[in-house]
Amino acid sequence: MDKFKIDGRCTLNGEVTISGAKNAALPILFATLLCDEEIHLSNVPRLKDVGTTIKLLEMLGATTKVNGNVTVLTGAVNNHVAPYELVKTMRASILALGPLAARFGAADVSLPGGCAIGARPVNLHVHGLELMGAKIAIEDGYIKARVDGRLKGAHILMDMVSVTGTENLMMAATLADGRTVIENAAREPEVVDLANFLNALGAKIQGAGTDTLTIDGVERLHGGSYSVQPDRIETGTFLVGAAVTGGKITCRKTDPTLLEAVLVKLEEAGALIEKGEDWITLDMTGRTLKPVTIKTAPYPAFPTDMQAQFTVLNAVAKGTGMVTETIFENRFMHVPELVRMGADIELQGNVAICRDTQQLKGAQVMATDLRASASLVLAGFVAEGSTIVDRIYHIDRGYEDIEHKLQGLGGRIERIKG
């Protein structure tokens, strides 16, 4: 199993180009199942999860071509089973459910795996599809959906805000008979990107970016080309890296409007922020890092996917900071690893109290999920001595070419093949 070796006490400086957003690319790739014509996608990040999704599409019968961009043709799809062997590694595989049920009237999707950071129930997906006329059974570890004819438009009130739940039902509704209204819908930029992609193929979706979506079903979607939006979480991770190491970096090919809550907190932490249409510069040179209070919540509030990185920021800031996690009940698994490095962090339920740590020390630590692994890498740059981060397959799921990007910023990091 690969690991990272990081030599600490280094400063991140320079420019980095941001990749396409994993959390936008995956649903867009699954949405190609709704269309039988060729689709060309650009700015798709080269990630383990993207590769898994492409394998799954091919297993279902799609033809794909990857040459910097991704071309998908699902006209020959003749299989509606998303097997455990692929789904177990990636929770986003649940996003095959809506498109398969809508276009083919049948979907067997294994109950998903992925990061072990909470219960993430599938009942929201199941209930919404049932309201649209699907008959669903959960048996043998699979969600099995069957539809007589077409799905029917429905009024769906989601019991809780769910990004993948919103995406699955929105995709299914594009080919349903009649109008579907989804209330308490997720507002995340990745949901908006998916809606924009579907509309580019001929879907009729209104309200993306608000908590109410209105989808008028169409008979079919046509092919087309689309560019995936930049990754706001990768952007935020690099910005925090510069903040905690006292450096100055510019993120290129990004979108500052996608992470306003993060930028506000970085300014509170003492960073100087400048931004343009597609770039952000953070300068922490000679400035004192201050702790911040954050509370994760659905967009446009502070994103849960930036919580671990800000836990590191608070651990090395001068003073006491507080991090409250409201999205997932088990998303502080990075804290014991940071404590191994000398961090003074106390957990009280869903709150992490981070007190001023004089100096983190290098240690051997274990990545437990995608964003936790990124936080441990950042901690390694701040620490004195060398840090080994094990189980970095997590980080490969969500960050494209991360060690080379960090090396380009002056980070002393190398991959040790397992």
From Swiss-Prot:
The modification 2-(S-cysteinyl)pyruvic acid O-phosphothioketal is found at residue 115. Keywords: Cell cycle, Cell division, Cell shape, Cell wall biogenesis/degradation, Cytoplasm, Peptidoglycan synthesis, Pyruvate, Transferase. GO terms for cellular component: cytoplasm. It catalyses: phosphoenolpyruvate + UDP-N-acetyl-alpha-D-glucosamine = UDP-N-acetyl-3-O-(1-carboxyvinyl)-alpha-D-glucosamine + phosphate. This is UDP-N-acetylglucosamine 1-carboxyvinyltransferase. It comes from Aeromonas hydrophila subsp. hydrophila (strain ATCC 7966 / DSM 30187 / BCRC 13018 / CCUG 14551 / JCM 1027 / KCTC 2358 / NCIMB 9240 / NCTC 8049). UDP-N-acetyl-alpha-D-glucosamine binds at residues 91, 305, 327. CDD domains: UdpNAET. The lineage of its organism: Bacteria, Pseudomonadati, Pseudomonadota, Gammaproteobacteria, Aeromonadales. One of its GO terms (biological process) is cell division. Phosphoenolpyruvate binds at residues 22-23. Its main location: cytoplasm. It is found in: Cytoplasm. The active site is at residue 115. Cell wall formation. Adds enolpyruvyl to UDP-N-acetylglucosamine. The keyword Lipid biosynthesis does not apply. GO terms for molecular function: UDP-N-acetylglucosamine 1-carboxyvinyltransferase activity. Its EC number is 2.5.1.7. Pfam families: EPSP_synthase (PF00275).
